[in-house]
């Protein structure tokens, strides 16, 4: 197994590369390219807990708006922002995951888990009096039209398919008689799926719109948009976010057959994609999710848009201190498929071992990243790029090629919006991408891009009528090199490819040069 660009260049295609793997290989310097998203729940909603997760590998904090009050979510945002201050310049991104057009059960009394046995007959109801009083006889769901779209013989799944109910009879306009097909528990606020059923829910509910406005007010960095079914859904979300939320990245969650069928138009509109395997694995046969994951990730890689793999990645660690071998392989396969980020849900929101789960995921990601044949991957992505490419993308491709030929330790990019960093990330260099920006929002959402280490430059933009443009550029480069060395992403004296614009502002990246990292004076001469 190789660590440097020269090692990668010495081997041929994927099969030859994999045949050379050394399972005991330890690179001289490890850096993780794939970001880790952690859902924050009551067990981890504190500055101390978030910093523990961060030290273990957290990059993005996720808030699930299917649960919790605005007061609770405000506390998550406040705690994440406070935790970020412990390491100034190292941003923590904040993601708002919408409820979307989903269906959920009501609450059980005192949030208890009610055991249920296979063969049990009960009523699924939309009667509001059971909303906070679900029992073994009556389980509330929040979709008022469920009796109109379901039919006897159909299956209703609850809690990512953990519970399955066969529809026996439509009793009245509020009640469905069902039979449990397996043992399990009736719990509070669990997701409900109706496979092979046309659900007439709007893409954005009034709650979703209010939640998005809350996100804009609190300057969240990204929105994970649930149950996206068509490209127009993304446009509708952008309209709600408005001018004040124009920098918020929209990540389309693909969770049903309609989203899969319309994926090309969704990809054209969205900033990124999440393979939300929980609901997807119920809405389509579970065996198809494997292929769907690979297809979605590949299409995102070709488009250069970030993609997240989520759901049940280390599910057993909700209760157990160590993951299963299958879970570690699942994480590794997501990485080798090409995911930019991997996500933890219940593992960090309510699990008994949240920090350990992040640490295990980080270790699994690192090992998987070392198995990827980066050079052949780069060549294939270059061949698939639609010509003519933009000037910025051409510069990104050239900088990655230079990093391979030079065996560079890093690519350092000065970016306003993060676009140039995204395009460099698209071509998957062997080395890390150090992104320096003055854009507070971009410094956070750049965690979506594989291999990017974003840093917020602390100095405000100068008046270029008084300050030389190139002097400001050099100052940012020196600062970035210094931080790279300080975080051990770089070693003193190593070669770095620097990517920059010829003037300030977005879309002007067209130049790269080669420098040496020197911790003493950080000179910018040619190596």
Curated annotation (Swiss-Prot):
This is Pyruvate kinase. One of its GO terms (biological process) is glycolytic process. Keywords: ATP-binding, Glycolysis, Kinase, Magnesium, Metal-binding, Nucleotide-binding, Potassium, Pyruvate, Transferase. Transmembrane segments: none annotated. It catalyses: pyruvate + ATP = phosphoenolpyruvate + ADP + H(+). GO terms for cellular component: cytoplasm. Substrate binds at residues 62, 278-279, 311. Pathway: Carbohydrate degradation; glycolysis; pyruvate from D-glyceraldehyde 3-phosphate: step 5/5.
